[in-house]
Amino acid sequence: MNTNEQKFESLAVTQVEVSVFQQGAYLGKLRGFATIILNGQLQIRGLRIMDSENGLYVGYPTDPYCREDFQHMVLPMTRELREHIENCVLEKYQQAIG
C-alpha cells in the first residue's frame, strides 16, 4: 500500500444538512436538497430529496453540462451504502418537516 493511501472498510454518514422546500407545482417532485459528510472527511452536496408514487427517495447529483443523458457525478457502489445514505437523509428530512 502506498504511504498516501489509507484503506477504509466502510463509509458512514457522519453529518446531514437538509434544506426543505415549500411544496408547489413549480418544484414538481422535488422536496428539498441535502448535503452529507462521510466519515467526517468527504462532503457531498446536491443530493435531491424527491417524492414519487412509491414514496420519498434520494437522487444523486448529476452533471449539468451533459446535454443528452443524466450523468451522475456521485453514486454509491453498494446497495448497503445507498440504503445507509438514503435512510440518514430521509430521517433528517422527516425531522425537519416535523
Predicted regions and their residues:
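Single-stranded nucleic acid-binding surfaces, predominantly the OB-fold ssDNA-binding core
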Residues: 1-98
